[in-house]
């Protein structure tokens, strides 16, 4: 909640929660769960940062500058934890690593800018797609 919604849940977020929870009721839930497990495994065991330079298509990166999400943070030492999830730095590094990429930083937005501030998210997305 801290990095996703600025520690404040709003009723307009309910539909996104219901969407995610609804997958568990679908007949294809085992497939969805398996894909989620594979994605989680990739995040933990196969860093893709080294492959960013291989991306050939124009790429838009939209980040919230308040985001400090860091998977595995609780397993790291305190000094390493302080260096994790610094998206205001990671966004710039990622943009430099991906050829033909554009970075949009949304101030005071957390991990889910498309939910937390849809209007600020959708404008640069549409502009990018229309190029």
Language-model-derived ranges and their functions:
Residues 8, 59, 102-103:
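Secondary-structure boundary/capping signal
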Residues 7-14, 131:
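Surface-exposed helix-capping loop/turn segments at secondary-structure junctions
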Residues 88-131:
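Catalytic active-site module of serine/aspartate enzymes centered on a nucleophile-bearing elbow/loop
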Residues 1-10, 19-24, 36-43:
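Helix-loop "lid/cap" segments that line or gate small-molecule binding pockets
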Residues 5-6, 25, 99, 130:
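Residues at helix-coil transition
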Residues 12-19, 30-31, 93:
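Exposed alpha-helical structural elements
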Residues 25-96:
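Conserved serine/cysteine hydrolase catalytic core
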């Amino acid at each position: 909640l801290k990095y996703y919604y600025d520690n404040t849940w709003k009723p307009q977020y309910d539909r996104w929660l219901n969407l995610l929870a609804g997958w568990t009721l679908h007949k294809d839930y085992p497939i969805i769960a398996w894909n989620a497990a594979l994605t989680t495994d990739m995040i933990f065991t196969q860093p893709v940062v080294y492959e960013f330079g291989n991306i050939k298509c124009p790429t838009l990166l939209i980040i919230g500058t308040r985001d400090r999400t860091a998977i595995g943070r609780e397993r790291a030492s305190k000094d390493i934890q302080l260096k994790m999830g610094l998206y205001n730095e990671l966004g710039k590094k990622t943009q430099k690593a991906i050829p033909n990429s554009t970075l949009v930083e949304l101030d005071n937005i957390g991990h889910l800018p498309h939910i937390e501030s849809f209007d600020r998210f959708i404008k640069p997305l549409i502009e990018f797609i229309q190029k």
